[in-house]
């Protein structure tokens, strides 16, 4: 793909979607534009564990506040459009929106995995996913776009490991999952993606099953370690706002009109991906969704499903699986080798 096409369709599309979302529309969901600092709930309950991107945005906010004390050509215009914190959210999320589109393009252009994806299809998928991400940001948070980028980065190294059986790819994938877990629990979907590939055929032998467990061991450990360490060092207290057991939203999600509309929209998007998926890949998407049931159940249990951003990671994952072509399932040809050796 020529550089000008990457600039126009892969970089500028997400930038314009972000500009339209943040400055063309004002969310009726919450008055983000006038927020001077992150609201208190980002430091409490389950939100308090998503600290990586929050700390970066806090530092960006302090930096912009210093800049706003000086005169510069766009200062008056920028102050009318939002606070330094709001502009920090825009810059941070736009940066990762661009990286996400670049990563989607980078993955889909690999012919060894996506031989049936041509340039026009690839650009169309980049456009579709960028539009869905931008559209979902009537709820603006600091961790969604970065979480999607890290999820895709994990997919990249998952595919590398699936094909080459190089232990270094598994190590890098596990490191990405560890970092991603400090940002948002979406990182667990990397494990679901890996498992969906490696369990393309259920291993018939005990040894084959143990090999599968070995493959998943490091990524699962990379998720569980930061997940539980964060909960040990940042405990939740009963009575606090957004305390896990006091913020169950399941009944609300099943009865509220907006919430029903939210999860029906998510189901419609998944149905849309199924419609365009290669027929032989629909089972892989279903397998991924079944393995991802803990994530899906959790967003129904404590999420607010009117926030369709909760379904976006599932959509990205399903799209990657929809067009993926691998030569042979792993367990169809595996000889009983340690999982850290290159498969030949």
Task: Please annotate each region the language model reported.
Residues 1-18:
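Start-transfer (signal-anchor) and selected internal transmembrane alpha helices
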Residues 19-22, 203-279, 284, 313:
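Membrane-lumen/periplasm interface segments of specific transmembrane helices
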Residues 20-37, 44-56, 60, 67-73, ...:
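Extracytoplasmic catalytic/substrate-binding loops of multi-pass membrane glycan-assembly enzymes
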Residues 79, 83, 87-114:
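Transmembrane-helix motifs of polytopic, lipid-linked glycan transferases
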Residues 103, 146-164, 169-172, 318-321:
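Specific aromatic-rich, kink-prone transmembrane helix
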Residues 105-108, 112, 118-135:
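Transmembrane and membrane-interface helices of multi-pass
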Residues 135-153, 183, 310-314:
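Multi-pass, polyprenyl lipid-linked donor-dependent membrane glycosyltransferases
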Residues 169-185, 190-196, 221:
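Membrane-interface alpha helices of multi-pass inner-membrane proteins
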């Amino acid at each position: 793909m020529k550089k000008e096409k990457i600039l126009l369709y892969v970089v500028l599309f997400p930038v314009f979607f972000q500009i339209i979302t943040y400055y063309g529309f004002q969310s009726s969901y919450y008055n983000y534009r006038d927020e001077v600092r992150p609201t208190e709930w980002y430091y409490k309950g389950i939100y308090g564990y998503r600290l990586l991107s929050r700390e970066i945005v806090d530092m960006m906010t302090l930096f912009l506040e210093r800049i706003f004390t000086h005169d510069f050509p766009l200062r008056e215009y920028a102050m009318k459009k939002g606070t330094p914190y709001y502009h920090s959210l825009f810059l941070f999320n736009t940066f990762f929106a661009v990286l996400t589109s670049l990563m989607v393009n980078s993955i889909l252009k690999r012919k060894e995995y996506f031989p049936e994806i041509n340039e026009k299809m690839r650009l169309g998928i980049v456009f579709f996913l960028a539009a869905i991400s931008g559209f979902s940001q009537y709820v603006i948070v600091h961790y969604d776009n970065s979480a999607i980028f890290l999820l895709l980065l994990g997919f990249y190294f998952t595919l590398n490991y699936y094909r080459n059986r190089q232990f270094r790819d598994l190590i890098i994938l596990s490191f990405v999952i560890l970092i991603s877990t400090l940002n948002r629990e979406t990182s667990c979907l990397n494990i679901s993606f890996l498992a969906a590939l490696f369990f393309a055929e259920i291993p018939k032998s005990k040894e084959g099953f143990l090999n599968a467990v070995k493959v998943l061991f490091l990524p699962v450990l990379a998720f569980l370690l930061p997940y539980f360490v964060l909960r040990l060092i940042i405990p939740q207290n009963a009575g606090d706002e957004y305390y896990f057991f006091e913020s169950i939203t399941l009944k609300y999600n099943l009865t509220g009109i907006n919430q029903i509309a939210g999860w029906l929209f998510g189901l419609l998007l998944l149905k849309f991906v199924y419609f365009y998926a290669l027929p032989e890949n629909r089972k892989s998407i279903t397998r991924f969704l079944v393995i991802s049931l803990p994530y899906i159940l959790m967003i129904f249990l404590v999420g607010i499903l009117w926030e369709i951003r909760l379904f976006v990671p599932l959509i990205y994952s399903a799209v990657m699986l929809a067009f993926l072509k691998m030569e042979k399932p792993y367990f169809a040809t595996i000889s009983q080798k340690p999982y850290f050796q290159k498969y030949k």
